[in-house]
Structures are given as structure tokens and as C-alpha cells.
Amino acid sequence: MHPAHLLVLLAVCVSLLGASDIPPLPLNLAQFGFMIKCANHRSRPVSHYMDYGCYCGKGGSGTPVDELDRCCQVHDECYGEAEKRFKCVPYMTLYSWKCYGTAPSCNTKTDCQRFVCNCDAKAAECFARSPYQNKNWNINTKARCK
């Protein structure tokens, strides 16, 4: 084997090893991302909603910094209600839905799926009507979310 081929093979192996450390998103979060794109045809990447304010992203505490952050707080509470009512895991719950223009519409069977889908649809619609303020992206949550 030529040395150049060995280098390419080594590079592929190293990159695959690095990629194996990146955890995949739960499928529900991927669905939620598509739902956000449906409701909100803005050009902002969905990833910008993952680290916004005190509630958009993992966890959440304190007072929401604005209307958009409040959407995330309500979404978190909705998922908490799904866990209590239906003993399901919202982040792992897949559901069926369609996009009609800018309106996500849930058409799923089980109570848990329907509830989680409605949580996501309401949040996506809330995101669409709430202004995005760059100053609230990637904030110091320890200082601002008390």
C-alpha cells in the first residue's frame, strides 16, 4: 500500500473515532427542530435556540429574559406535564405531524405522542411570533438566571 493511502486511511479512522464521542440528538429534538423551521421561516439556524436565555436549551432556572425565553420555559413545563400525566419520556417520544404553510399540525395516535407533539407545536408557534435578541444568546446563565 502506498504511504499516501495509509495517511488517508489513518485520517478516516481518527475522524471516525472522534465522531463516536459526539452524542446523537434524541430523535424528538430533531423533530422539534423541523417543526421550528415549519413555523418560523426565518433564516436563523435552529441551533441558535439551543443556547438562548435561561430556558432555551438544557435545563432552565430563574426568570426568563424575554418573550422567546418564556416560550422555552412554557415548553419545559409542558414536557414536565407529559412526564407526570403519561409517564413518558418527551425527549425520546416520536410523533407524527405535518407542516401546513407555517402551521405545524399533529396527527398522532397515543396520548403521550399527541401531548408532546402539541407541546412542540405550541412552542414552535411561540418562537415564530417572539423577537430574537442576539444579546440573549449564549448568556452567562449563572449570573443572569437567578
From Swiss-Prot:
Main subcellular location of this protein, as a coarse class: secreted
Keyword Chloroplast in annotation: no
Gene3D superfamilies registered for this protein in UniProt: Phospholipase A2 domain (1.20.90.10)
GO biological process: arachidonate secretion; lipid catabolic process; phospholipid metabolic process
Textual note on the cofactor: Binds 1 Ca(2+) ion.
Binding site for Ca(2+): Y55, G57, G59, D76
Catalytic residues of the enzyme: H75, D120
UniProt keyword annotations, A-Z: Calcium, Disulfide bond, Hydrolase, Lipid degradation, Lipid metabolism, Metal-binding, Neurotoxin, Presynaptic neurotoxin, Secreted, Signal, Toxin
UniProt enzyme class: hydrolase
UniProt-listed InterPro entries: PLipase_A2, PLipase_A2_Asp_AS, PLipase_A2_dom, PLipase_A2_dom_sf, PLipase_A2_His_AS
UniProt-listed Enzyme Commission number(s): 3.1.1.4
Molecular function terms from GO: calcium ion binding; calcium-dependent phospholipase A2 activity; phospholipid binding; toxin activity
Keyword hit for Metal-binding: yes
UniProt family annotation: Belongs to the phospholipase A2 family. Group I subfamily. D49 sub-subfamily.
Quaternary state and interactors: Heterotrimer of alpha, beta, and gamma chains; non-covalently linked.
Stated role: Heterotrimer: Snake venom phospholipase A2 (PLA2) heterotrimer that acts as a potent presynaptic neurotoxin by blocking synaptic transmission and synaptic vesicle recycling. May act by binding in a calcium-dependent fashion to neurotonal pentraxin-1 (NPTX1) and neurotonal pentraxin-2 (NPTX2), but not to neuronal pentraxin receptor (NPTXR). Also binds to taipoxin-associated calcium binding protein 49 (RCN2), a protein localized in the lumen of endoplasmic reticulum. Monomer (alpha chain): Snake venom phospholipase A2 (PLA2) alpha chain that possesses the same high enzymatic activity than the heterotrimer. PLA2 catalyzes the calcium-dependent hydrolysis of the 2-acyl groups in 3-sn-phosphoglycerides.
The protein's name: Basic phospholipase A2 paradoxin-like alpha chain
